[in-house]
Design a protein with these regions (language model features):
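Long, charged, low-complexity intrinsically disordered regions
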Residues: 1-86
Length: 86
């Protein structure tokens, strides 16, 4: 189910490079432009992969670590670019 939150705890790091872009594209399709990606605090491996992937996606307007109430450095908040209306 696509609800704007992607929890990566159950995924292997090698899956994340394909999973994150696919999930974000599906979010855009249904009008979700603010997404939370939960990568966990741990050693930072998943966070690094997620941030690397996000920095390469042209449809990502902005991303940052979440605030304390949203998962702190265990989650990243992503804002997707909106499609301009003609």
């Amino acid at each position: 189910m696509i609800n704007g939150t992607l929890d990566l705890h159950t995924f292997h790091p090698s899956d994340v490079k394909a999973l994150v872009p696919d999930y974000l594209i599906e979010c855009k399709k249904i009008g979700i432009y603010d997404v939370r990606i939960i990568h966990g605090k741990g050693t930072g491996v998943l966070r690094g992969i997620v941030h690397s992937v996000l920095s390469e996606l042209s449809y990502v307007a902005h991303f940052q670590l979440a605030g304390e109430s949203e998962g702190a450095w265990g989650a990243t908040l992503v804002t997707l670019k909106r499609i301009a209306s003609p």
